[in-house]
Amino acid sequence: KAVNTMDSMVGYKNERYLNFGRTAAKLDDVVNYIPARISAALMIAAAYGPGKQFSGKDALRIFKRDRYNHASPNSAQTEAACAGALHLCLAGDASYFGKIVKKPFIGDDLRPVEAEDIVRVNVLLYRSAVIGEILCLLALLVVTLF
């Protein structure tokens, strides 16, 4: 958590925090490399679940296409899976210290973002967590039995 917070606070490219920020950003990239990919895989699996509110096929397609559409190697992993699952276009230009910074979009612009998407993404996240818990319990069971 400390590494992530440090990256969020000073990891951006800024003359004042250049050396400290670069260290925080690179450390965050290393520490979160595997968890970001596991989380994206769980989100894609969750999107294939029951109901028609998510698209597992599009989650996988957008993940493959847009997972590196961010300066950090980890940030767009789950964002791409989520954008595809919900048929949304996320990210894009951002404002830092009053300046607009051009950034790539993640996902296809198939529909506008709406308030109900907060509920939808929470369902997707809960499904992802349950799948992750089941996989951990199965791994624990296998290790315990063998």
Per-range role (PLM):
Residues K1-F146:
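Hydrophobic alpha-helical transmembrane segments
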